[in-house]
């Protein structure tokens, strides 16, 4: 047998192993870069979505959806929206650094009048990478686009011929008639299409609202009169709604025992339907005596943290936003953008009220700020922030919720 020397091939295995290790390390490093870019892409899209929703909230807070032709409110919405976006960007970092706006937010009040849109583009440059630089020395950049809208059902039927229903939760059990006490009993909502009636002004009040009990005063409140006597010289009446106990309700520690009081204090998860021509709620004709006014007084005191309730300053409005100052909790003494004093109340069609059964048709919602409550008389002092109407021709599809709490939900829009 002939034996050949392989001395020239000695050490090649070590070289191959070394090259393999280097290749594996390079692939691992590239994988890290890919994950970094993928994570940054996800983070910037989340940041863009959050910023767009914050900007859309300005449409609600400014009142521009309730008065869609008011140029001053549109200007205010732009200013508030940009401020909200800049504030939230600092809290939504991409790769450890806040993203920046690419250009300026685009505010669209004309495509769907009364249901405005906002579009923003975010950018994050100079992302940290390692081995990926062998293909390009330029630091990678990620961008994201997000669009959101504030949906006020008042404008839906006028825009499209039918309205997309809303089904808000955490609605307080005070049914208010479609009569604006600040405009001599003119309607809040036009019945044919659910649009907000001309002449309504965002920020009306503060106005005292009265319970509809039989005359007598003090604790001698009997069954509510349906309809009540002529409206008082100032303010109007509210009616107690029938409520259903719900174990899922979110309640504060000060909650009471009755279902009616708890529905005032808690976030009541029983959703209200709105619109159409069929009765969908009822006035509670069984609440009597001192218990009724006690429930109202104690319920609202608990809800708004009396005597340390939040305050509303509308002196800058509409050139500047209404300012809410917290007077309790960790934010006490500071300006806040939300408050437990902001409530949603159902509006009913007083022209179709069934006086025998108390059945009513909810045709919209009021968003109001509660200032005070008088336990002896059942009076509640409120300022009106927004009005939402529902038409009589509901369209197909699921109700718009946007989180389920606000009567004017904000939501992301995807083309």
Model-derived segments and spans:
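Surface-exposed patches in mature extracellular/periplasmic domains of secreted proteins
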Residues: 62-67, 92-107
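Acidic, polar loop-rich interaction surfaces within structured domains
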Residues: 96, 128-129
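Structured segments of extracytoplasmic/periplasmic soluble domains
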Residues: 54-58, 80-95, 149
């Amino acid at each position: 047998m002939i034996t050949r020397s392989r001395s020239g091939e000695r050490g090649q295995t070590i070289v191959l192993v070394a090259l393999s290790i280097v290749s594996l390390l390079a692939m691992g490093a590239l994988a890290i870069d890919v994950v970094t870019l993928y994570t940054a892409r996800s983070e910037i899209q989340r940041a863009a979505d959050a910023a767009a929703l914050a900007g859309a909230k300005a449409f609600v807070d400014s009142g521009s959806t309730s008065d869609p032709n008011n140029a001053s409110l549109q200007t205010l919405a732009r200013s508030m929206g940009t401020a909200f976006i800049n504030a939230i960007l600092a809290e939504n970092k991409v790769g450890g650094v806040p993203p920046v706006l690419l250009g300026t937010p685009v505010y669209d009040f004309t495509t769907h009048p009364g249901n405005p849109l906002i579009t923003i583009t975010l950018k994050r440059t100079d992302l940290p990478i390692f081995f990926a630089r062998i293909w390009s020395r330029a630091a990678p950049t990620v961008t994201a686009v997000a669009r959101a809208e504030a949906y006020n059902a008042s404008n839906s039927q006028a825009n499209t011929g039918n309205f997309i229903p809303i089904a808000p939760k955490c609605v307080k059990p005070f049914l208010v008639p479609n009569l604006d006490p600040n405009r001599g009993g003119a309607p809040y909502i036009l019945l044919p299409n659910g649009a907000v009636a001309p002449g309504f002004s965002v920020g009306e009040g503060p106005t005292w609202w009265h319970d509809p009990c039989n005359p007598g005063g003090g604790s001698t409140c009997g069954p509510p009169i349906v309809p009540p006597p002529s409206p008082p010289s100032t303010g109007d009446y509210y009616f107690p709604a029938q409520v259903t106990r719900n174990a899922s309700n979110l309640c504060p520690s000060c909650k009471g025992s009755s279902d009616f009081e708890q529905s005032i204090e808690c976030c009541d998860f029983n959703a209200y339907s709105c619109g159409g021509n069929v009765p969908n709620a009822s006035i509670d004709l069984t609440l009597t005596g001192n218990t009724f006014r006690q429930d109202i007084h104690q319920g609202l005191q608990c809800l708004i943290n009396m005597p340390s309730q939040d305050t509303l300053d509308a002196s800058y409005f509409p050139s500047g936003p209404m300012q809410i100052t917290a007077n309790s909790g960790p934010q006490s003494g500071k300006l806040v953008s939300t408050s437990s004093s902001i409530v949603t109340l159902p509006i009913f069609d007083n022209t179709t009220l069934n006086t025998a059964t108390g059945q009513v048709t909810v045709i919209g919602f009021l968003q109001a700020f509660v200032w005070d409550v008088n336990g002896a008389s059942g009076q509640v002092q409120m300022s009106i922030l927004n009005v939402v109407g529902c038409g009589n021709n509901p369209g197909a599809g699921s109700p718009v919720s946007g989180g389920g709490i606000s009567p004017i939900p904000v939501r992301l829009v995807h083309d």
